[in-house]
Amino acid sequence: MESSSPAMSVAIAVLAALLGLTGFGVYTAFGPPSKNLDDPFDDHED
């Protein structure tokens, strides 16, 4: 098998990092850690 090019390795690394950050953001927004998030609109009654 031919060794992969450096560009393909970098592209896969960037894609993995973006998918990881997206997954972490969704988990933080909708998973169990979301119970600790504050809603700024509820904090300021008009």
Curated annotation (Swiss-Prot):
Membrane-spanning residues: 10-30
Main location: membrane
Domain of life: Bacteria
Disulfide bonds, paired cysteine numbers: none
One annotated Gene Ontology cellular component of this protein: plasma membrane-derived thylakoid membrane
UniProt KW keywords: Membrane, Thylakoid, Transmembrane, Transmembrane helix
Entry membrane topology: Single-pass membrane protein
Its job: May play a role in photosystem I and II biogenesis.
Family that this chain belongs to: Belongs to the PsbN family.
NCBIfam families recorded: PRK13183.1
HAMAP family with a match to the protein in the record: PSII_PsbN
Protein name per its UniProtKB record: Protein PsbN
Organism, as annotated: Synechococcus sp. (strain CC9311)
Primary gene name: psbN
